[in-house]
Regions:
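Extended catalytic cores of very large enzyme megasubunits
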Residues: 2-201
Length: 201
């Protein structure tokens, strides 16, 4: 038995299938283009969660992913800090949040609809949930490569990145001396981000 997997399962927050069942056939109060926009932009492929599944999520499934993801983040935070988690209270609050989300009385930011409750957020980074970020260039002379790599990483997960010009004039771009160094770039987001830092540093 994988102890870490068992602990992970104990800590995971879930809404019951019984609670979700009536929502499978309930009417969603979409506007004229709401459903099309949702399916195009926020509905994830079901194969991400079940390799045998085909197609994309329906609204009741997206709501479940988002609410369970949201409460998993909260529950993991509480457990990591050794605080008291009240599962009954969490279930009540989550059911209320689900009902309101399903009926479009509230929604998270679009990035929350798109990414919350996914393996990417759980296993790699929650940065994909962020709409915007900002970096100062004040330390460009000492952190140049890192700053640009950080911005590239953020941009590649869809974050809009703002910056100031406090570092203007602190670095000069010179023609590099020839080198026969070879850098193998992993064909992944992380690999390309690292390549930019290596190039600039």
């Amino acid at each position: 038995i994988n102890i870490m997997r068992t602990i992970e399962n104990i800590r995971r927050f879930r809404l019951s299938d019984t609670f979700i069942e009536p929502y499978k056939t309930a009417k969603v109060p979409w506007g004229p283009i709401g459903y099309i926009t949702y399916k195009r932009t926020y509905s994830r492929r079901l194969s991400e969660f079940d390799p045998q599944a085909t197609g994309t999520e329906e609204w009741h499934q997206t709501c479940r992913r988002v609410i369970e993801g949201m409460f998993n983040v909260q529950k993991q935070h509480v457990v990591m800090l050794g605080l008291c988690w009240n599962d009954q209270k969490a279930q009540t609050t989550a059911k209320d949040a689900y009902e309101r989300l399903f009926n479009l009385k509230w929604t998270p930011p679009g990035r929350g609809l798109w990414m919350m409750g996914t393996k990417f957020v759980e296993e790699k980074t929650g940065a994909a949930l962020f709409n915007c970020a900002f970096r100062s260039t004040k330390e460009l002379a000492t952190k140049g490569g890192y700053l640009f790599a950080w911005m590239m990483d953020a941009l590649m997960v869809g974050i809009g990145v703002g910056f100031d010009t406090l570092g203007a004039g602190t670095l000069r771009i010179a023609e590099p001396t020839y080198t026969d160094d070879v850098h193998i770039i992993d064909d992944s987001r992380e690999g390309w981000v690292r390549s930019v830092q290596v190039l600039l540093d």
